[in-house]
């Protein structure tokens, strides 16, 4: 971290992207500034954002590969230049972009002689390859080569114990870290009692998301992390009664919900489609898969109903709360969407 004296202003706190470039398909760079900050605040924000960017951003990668008739990962396969271990390492480097949650299957099935690249991976519809030219293996003979793959979205660095699996599958140490590196520097500006700080933040990503998208997601994760402290504890409610209870994401929700209940204007809920609610594509797809097409369908579901939907997560509940709170001018019933 570097501190230097530079000229600056004392305007309202704001951020801006001052540089953005694509060095390669798997290397994006972005440089951002946040200013003006009081003395010490730049360090606080810089440290928190750096840790969130490196450890809290989710990524998608290949976590397991299954070969046929391979005794161990150090084996060689006739007609293939690389060993099984080298193929696993190449698969580990494949960069994927997706909004999937949970585990999905993929595969490779080709006939040699030819080079196998990431483009040869048969993926589920929700997953795409960032760099299709990434190498996997070189088939030197006319053989049929097939691999079954497992894909998962997670965060951080996941390792599994090495052991021989009877079905011929091998774990791949997953690196679910779309952000490759983060640097920040602090510059002081002003004179005397009017000194302020400017935070410069540099972000490098692997191409599965842009630095701006990574910064947004890291900021949202930090907000969600601190959000529980904004909720006042209800009087007369013990910790044991409250420990398993979900708290809506905005501390002003109860107040706004009261205002919504005062609105007696009748609205045909079956004519308001969830397409109009500005939901994220992931939340929207989850609801669509559960045959929830209108606001009436949504309000007819309980928390338990929604949580039984495949791939539906707590973040989706929060997002639905935010959206309804912002756009819903109707009288919500206590037993409707009670989460």
UniProtKB/Swiss-Prot annotation:
GO cellular component, one term: chloroplast
Reactions catalysed according to its record: RNA(n) + a ribonucleoside 5'-triphosphate = RNA(n+1) + diphosphate
Annotated spans, Alpha C-terminal domain (alpha-CTD): 264-339
GO biological process, one term: DNA-templated transcription
Database matches in CDD domains: RNAP_alpha_NTD (cd06928)
MF terms in GO: DNA binding; DNA-directed RNA polymerase activity; protein dimerization activity
UniProt keyword terms in alphabetical order: Chloroplast, DNA-directed RNA polymerase, Nucleotidyltransferase, Plastid, Transcription, Transferase
EC number, UniProt record: 2.7.7.6
Alpha N-terminal domain (alpha-NTD): annotated segments: 1-233
Pfam families: RNA_pol_A_bac, RNA_pol_A_CTD, RNA_pol_L
Cellular compartments annotated: Plastid, Chloroplast
Predominant localisation class: plastid
Family listed: Belongs to the RNA polymerase alpha chain family.
Protein's job: DNA-dependent RNA polymerase catalyzes the transcription of DNA into RNA using the four ribonucleoside triphosphates as substrates.
Classification via HAMAP family: RNApol_bact_RpoA
NCBIfam families: rpoA
This protein's domain notes: The N-terminal domain is essential for RNAP assembly and basal transcription, whereas the C-terminal domain is involved in interaction with transcriptional regulators and with upstream promoter elements.
Subunit structure: In plastids the minimal PEP RNA polymerase catalytic core is composed of four subunits: alpha, beta, beta', and beta''. When a (nuclear-encoded) sigma factor is associated with the core the holoenzyme is formed, which can initiate transcription.
Protein name: DNA-directed RNA polymerase subunit alpha
Species name: Psathyrostachys rupestris (Hordeum rupestre)
Gene symbol of the encoding locus: rpoA
């Amino acid at each position: 971290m570097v501190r230097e004296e530079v000229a600056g202003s004392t305007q309202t706190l704001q951020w801006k992207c001052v540089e953005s470039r694509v060095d390669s398909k798997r290397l994006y760079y972005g440089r951002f500034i946040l200013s003006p900050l009081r003395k010490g605040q730049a360090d606080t924000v810089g440290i928190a954002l750096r840790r969130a960017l490196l450890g809290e951003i989710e990524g998608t990668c290949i976590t397991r590969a299954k070969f046929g008739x391979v005794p161990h990962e150090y084996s060689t396969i006739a007609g293939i230049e690389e060993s099984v271990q080298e193929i696993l390492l190449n698969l580990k480097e494949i960069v994927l972009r997706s909004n999937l949650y949970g585990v999905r299957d993929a595969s490779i099935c080709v006939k040699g002689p030819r080079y196998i690249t990431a483009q040869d991976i048969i993926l589920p519809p929700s997953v795409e390859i960032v760099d299709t030219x990434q190498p996997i293996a070189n088939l030197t003979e006319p053989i049929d080569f097939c691999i079954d793959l497992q894909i998962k979205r997670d965060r951080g660095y996941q390792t599994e114990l090495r052991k021989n699996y009877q079905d011929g599958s091998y774990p791949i140490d997953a690196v679910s870290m779309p952000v490759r590196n983060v640097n920040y520097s602090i510059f002081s500006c002003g004179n005397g009692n009017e000194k302020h700080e400017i935070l410069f933040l540099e972000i490098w990503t692997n191409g599965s998301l842009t630095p701006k998208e990574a910064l947004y997601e890291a900021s949202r994760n930090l907000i969600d992390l601190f959000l529980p402290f904004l909720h006042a504890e209800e009087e007369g409610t013990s910790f044991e009664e409250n420990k398993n209870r979900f708290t809506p994401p905005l501390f002003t929700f109860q107040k706004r919900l009261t205002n919504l209940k005062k609105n007696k204007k009748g609205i045909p809920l079956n004519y308001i489609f969830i397409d109009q609610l500005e939901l994220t594509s992931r939340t929207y797809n989850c609801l669509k898969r559960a045959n929830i097409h209108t606001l009436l369908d949504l309000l007819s579901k309980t928390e338990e109903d929604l949580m039984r939907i495949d791939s539906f997560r707590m973040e989706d509940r929060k997002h639905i709360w935010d959206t309804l709170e912002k756009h819903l001018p109707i009288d919500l019933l206590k037993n409707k969407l009670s989460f």
